[in-house]
Amino acid sequence: EMSTTHSELELEAIRICQELIRIPSVNYGEGKGDEKAVADYIAALLSEVGIEPTIYESAPGRCNVIARIKGSNSQRPGLVVHGHIDVVPANADDWSVDPFSGVIKDGFIWGRGAVDMKNMDAMILATVRDWKRTGYVPERDIILAFFADEEAGSIYGSHYMVKNHPEVFAGCTEAVSEVGGFSVTVTGGKRLYLIETAEKGIHWMRLTAEGRAGHGSMMNDDNAITRLSEAVAKIGRFEWPQRYSKTVKAFFKRIAEETG
C-alpha cells in the first residue's frame, strides 16, 4: 500500500507510473513494436491540463508524443525534457508478479518499465501537470518528448523526429535525458547519489572467414564457420585491461570516505 506521507504530487507520479506500466508498449526489435496506446494515454494526460500534444507516427503504431510549454522569457533557449515509452519484452514466467500489473509490493512499484523508464515519464508528466494546476510558468520553453523505439535503435523514435521534424526542437540548446543512475544506500542508512560522467562506446566489427567448400555428407577440416566461431570465442576470452580514469579514482576515494 502507498504511504500516507507522500505528497499529492508524488501520489500522482505513482499513479501515472502504474498506469503506464499497465499499458504494454513492448518493443520486439526489427521494427516490431507498438507505442500507440501509451502515446494516446500520455497525450490525454497533457490535454487534460491544457498542454497541447502532437503525436507523430513514424510507422503504423510507432508513436512519439511532443509538446511545448511556453516559458516566460522567449529570449532564453529551450530545454528538451525527454524519455522513451517503449519497453523490452517480459517473460511472465520469470516474474513473481504480472510484469504489466504495476502493483505496489514491498514499497516498490513492480512491472516492466518501472525502472526503464516509465518511472521517469511519470515524474515528468506529474510535474508539468502540477505546473498547470498551480499556475507555474518556467523561465524558458520546455519541450516534452516521449519517444518510441529507444530499446531497438531509436529508428522510429528520436532519429525519426530529428530527421523529419527538426522544427520541434528549434531554439533548444540543452536536454535532460534518461535517468543516469540510482541512489545507493550504504552503512548507517546514508544514501549516496552517484554521478555518471561517461559510458562505454561501441565498436562494430565485420569478421570474414574463408575455408574449403564442402558438403554436409563429408567431414571438412577447413570449415569457414568453425574458424569464424573460434575467432568470436577468442574475443570473448580476451581479458580487457583495467583502466582507472581520474573520475573513477575520485569515486573510489569518496566511497571509501563515506563507508569507512
Predicted regions and their residues:
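Predominant activation on well-ordered alpha-helical scaffold segments within soluble catalytic domains
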Residues: 14, 18, 43, 122-129, ...
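Fold-independent oxyanion-binding glycine-rich loops
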Residues: 83-85, 178-180, 209
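Acidic/histidine-rich catalytic neighborhood of metal-dependent amide-processing enzymes
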Residues: 109, 115-194
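Acidic-enriched catalytic cores of C-N bond-cleaving enzymes acting on peptides and small amides
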Residues: 166-173, 181-190, 196-204, 216-260
